[in-house]
Every structure is written in structure tokens, then in C-alpha cells.
């Protein structure tokens, strides 16, 4: 439960082959207190490989705070975050990312003056890969997300749906085990929402926890 006055729930699309050994994320009684009030009051969550879990609830229920505690942007007052059998409660965000926790923020995070492929290559350059490996990985992501035709376009010219495809592609550069999506359909037109939904479903089929 999150916030005694306004609880939220976790809606889950399970993986048919999930087992206990495939548990990717567990939260144990997470609590966050602001101004003497528990805005998050003991949330438990379990996410396995190949599962999609969504946090549902009204505004002010504590969804964003819970999300931030999981990715490492906010430190809980009590409780634990277990990621791939490691207690990461005290880990900063970058250490969680190194373990395979991907994060796609609601706010636009692309480099607007760079091209689509430059945006992907910029993230790839942070990895210990050769130039050829970076190029191949970039081409693979461009193809996977159907953005090859706009690879040379600057990011500021993209539609909402194209930007979302690019941001998801960038978040997968490090090949995470878990992808945290904050309002993934925000700023996306209704027609493109379906395309983004299909991308998420396909990622789930590949075994990614979402």
C-alpha cells in the first residue's frame, strides 16, 4: 500500500515461463516520509523476467516517489530494494544502472541538436566497445525500432512517437535486465501510442522485465 489515504496498486502482465529464479526486482516494505507524513507506506513489489508491471493510482498516491526509490533518485526511510539478488537500497543510480537497471524518464532526455544515430552512438561511446561494435549495435537498434529512415534527422525535428522510439532505443544500449518507464505514452499522439505499446510487448517477449 502507498499512502494510507490513497493507495495505489500494481497491475501485472505475467511471463508464462517465469520462475522464482528469474526474479529481477523485489521491493520490501518501502517507506518514504515527507514532512512527518508517510507518502509511501510499505510497498511490496515483485517483477520477474518477461513481466510488465504498472503502478496504478490517483494523483498524489505515491507512484512517482515509489518509482524514484526503485531507480535510486530518492532514498527510502525504511525498506529494501533488491535487484537481481543484490540489495541496492543504498546504491546510487549509476551503480544500479551498471547492474542492469534501465530508466526512461518522462522528461525528454535526447540531445535535440544531434541526429538520431548520433544520439544512440553518444551512449554507446560510454561502453568498452570498438568503433565497429558501436556501429553495428547502433544499426541494430535503428532497425529494431524502425527508425533507420530518420537516422540522419536531427532529434528536434522528430514527432512525439519518433522521439519515444529513440529514447527507448537509447535506454537499451546497455542491454538492461529491467527497464523502468515513467509515463511512456506522455507526449505521444494517439496513433503512435499503439506502436509504442507493441514495442513494449516485444521487449517483454525478449525476456526484459518492465
Predicted regions and their residues:
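The feature captures the beta-strand-to-loop junction immediately N-terminal to the Walker
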Residues: 56-58
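Conserved ABC transporter NBD signature motif
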Residues: 79-86, 99, 137
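Conserved ABC ATPase "signature" region
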Residues: 132-150, 198-201
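Conserved ABC ATPase signature
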Residues: 154-158, 162
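Conserved catalytic motifs of ABC-family nucleotide-binding domains
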Residues: 175
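Catalytic Walker B motif of ABC-type/P-loop ATPase nucleotide-binding domains
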Residues: 179-182
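Helical segment within the ABC ATPase nucleotide-binding domain
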Residues: 194-206
